């Protein structure tokens, strides 16, 4: 009887922690505004052909660097809203979706398919890319202005084509 009570207590604690963690993943976005002088560091990633992806090549466009993985439910949930946002600004916004999948391109392809034609996918070239950028988990996104300066970070999955974040992207795209 005593072991049953202990087991039930552990089950309830585990359930409570799981529910709190799930809620935290979909909390309102935390945007950390940065000074314009904060230039984003090089991000080690490679495209499907194995070529390095360079943020410097995207200067002149607003860039969302989205760190994700195919096994991450919040990552998978936010991809359609990133696609819709990128489709709204095809000439001014690049969404660079950098996968942290250990299984590489086969894992990406199983999820990606042809679902996200407006997003540019890449694979992290180093296993600790998340840690290098100060992220504690996935998804994790950096917002970069047209001059290559970081203007915000989103440390969780969100709906990108709604609310405050959509307004920030619209303002960034409008500034030339």
Where does each model-flagged region fall?
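Bacterial N-terminal signal peptides
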Residues: 9-16
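Structural microenvironment flanking redox-active thiols in thiol-disulfide oxidoreductases
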Residues: 76-115, 125-131
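Short loop/turn microsegments at loop-to-beta-strand junctions
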Residues: 40-41, 63, 138-140
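Thiol/disulfide oxidoreductase modules built on the thioredoxin-like
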Residues: 110-118, 124-171
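N-terminal "domain-start" segment that seeds a small globular fold
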Residues: 25-55
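Short active-site neighborhood of thiol/selenol oxidoreductases, capturing the structured segment around
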Residues: 55-73
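Positively charged n-region of N-terminal signal peptides that target proteins for export
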Residues: 1-4
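Conserved hydrophobic packing residues within short motifs/helices of P-loop NTPase cores
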Residues: 63-65, 96-98, 142
